[in-house]
């Protein structure tokens, strides 16, 4: 029986983003193990219900102590040796680097890494990269080079990240595979007619500055001076990352009446009540929140940056704006106020884009082909695919 191990630094992502893939693999007779730190009972049971075996491992999601990382990598390698997986798939920054090393040390035959996005270290601020961020970026690039040297295939979600890694000589082009977005279940996210008469904008993101939260708020201020009745919803939880928005900041915006902050709540009920989805992020992999908005048929305003530009055909299903540009963001919002018919036509175009590029069933089939392409144990899998 083919054995496959997922390694992640965030246990809930196994069900939220990999659940359908894990179930498809288990249904094919593949034995799936999932390594993550800090499984809670709910996530553990959810993983087991998919047919996989959850295994706790030590991994600091954001810590930067090299001795702790080396110790955790050695312990992870020991765990991998016990189960002898044929394939390991690592995703998120720490697993990509240290999970790939551990898999190499453990003698795993086929090692896959997935770059879901490059994060704040690779994201310039309004004045460019600070000295500290440049130093940190260089260090992370060296770690990526070390980790990716232990990977047989590296999956990218957008071509900008792929090209940046190749240009930096972190890996050869032959090792790369361009997937696109991870996709959404189009049956669970069906098209719904967008709200036209009561114009409502929605942003869904972790409350980080690099997600463009402040740009969204400043654009809302501009638009509300013209029409105070327009609503601006913000969904997302507080975060402990360096670029986090504080509770006092977001609460002040909420109390001011600029935005309606709902915190961490289910997204779908809010999406169906909105007119236009907005994500002025500084950089992404390919954001799942935007893919969900496309699926239900909402126009999208987002930034012309890696990962975001892949979700919008400018002027067809929404608009692209420059990063750090709340005035131009407000201008596009006002366009929907002045031309409400665009909400419907662009919403239909968004749904079509989701059907063509972000169907999770099609995406997972490509992943399964890649996973099974280097082993003879997976007779049920489709033929191997070439690197994109």
Where is each model-derived feature located?
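A conserved mid-protein helix/loop that constitutes part of the nucleotide-sugar donor-binding site
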Residues: 15-20, 199, 203, 208-222, ...
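A short, well-ordered alpha-helix in the C-terminal region of glycosyltransferases
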Residues: 328, 335, 342-357, 363-368
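Donor nucleotide-sugar binding/catalytic pocket of nucleotide-sugar-dependent glycosyltransferases
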Residues: 55-56, 137, 141-191
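Aromatic "clamp/platform" in nucleotide-sugar-dependent glycosyltransferases that forms part
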Residues: 282
């Amino acid at each position: 029986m083919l054995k496959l191990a997922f390694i992640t630094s965030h246990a809930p992502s196994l069900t939220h983003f990999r659940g359908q893939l894990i179930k498809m693999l288990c249904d094919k007779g593949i034995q799936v193990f999932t390594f993550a730190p800090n499984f809670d009972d709910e996530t553990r049971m959810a993983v087991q219900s998919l047919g996989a075996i959850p295994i706790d491992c030590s991994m600091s999601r954001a810590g930067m102590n090299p001795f702790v990382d080396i110790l955790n990598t050695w312990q992870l390698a020991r765990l991998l040796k016990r189960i002898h997986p044929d394939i390991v798939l690592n995703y998120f920054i720490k697993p990509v680097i240290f999970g790939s090393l551990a898999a190499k040390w453990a003698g795993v035959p086929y090692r896959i890494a997935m770059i879901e996005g490059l994060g704040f270290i690779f994201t310039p601020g309004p004045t460019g990269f600070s000295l500290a961020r440049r130093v940190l970026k260089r260090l992370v690039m060296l770690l990526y080079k070390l980790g990716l040297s232990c990977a047989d295939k590296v999956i990218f979600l957008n071509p900008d990240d792929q090209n940046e890694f190749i240009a930096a000589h972190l890996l050869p082009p032959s090792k790369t595979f361009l997937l696109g977005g991870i996709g959404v279940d189009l049956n669970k996210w069906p098209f719904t007619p967008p709200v036209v008469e009561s114009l409502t904008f929605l942003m869904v993101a972790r409350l980080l500055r690099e997600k463009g939260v402040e740009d969204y708020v400043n654009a809302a201020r501009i638009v509300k001076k013209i029409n105070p009745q327009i609503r601006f919803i913000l969904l997302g939880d507080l975060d402990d990352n360096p670029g986090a928005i504080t509770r006092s900041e977001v609460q002040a915006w909420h109390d001011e009446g600029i935005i309606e902050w709902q915190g961490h709540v289910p997204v779908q009920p809010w999406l169906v009540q909105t007119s236009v989805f907005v994500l002025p992020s500084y950089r992404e992999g390919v954001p799942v929140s935007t893919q969900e908005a496309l699926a239900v048929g909402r126009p999208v305003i987002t930034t012309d940056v890696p990962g975001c530009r892949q979700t919008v055909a400018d002027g067809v299903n929404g608009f692209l704006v420059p990063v750090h540009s709340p005035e131009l963001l407000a201008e596009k919002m006002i366009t929907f106020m002045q031309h409400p018919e665009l909400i419907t036509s662009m919403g239909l175009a968004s749904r079509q884009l989701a059907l063509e590029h972000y169907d999770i069933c099609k995406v997972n089939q490509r992943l399964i082909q890649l996973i099974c392409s280097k082993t003879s144990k997976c007779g049920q899998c489709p033929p191997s695919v070439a690197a994109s």
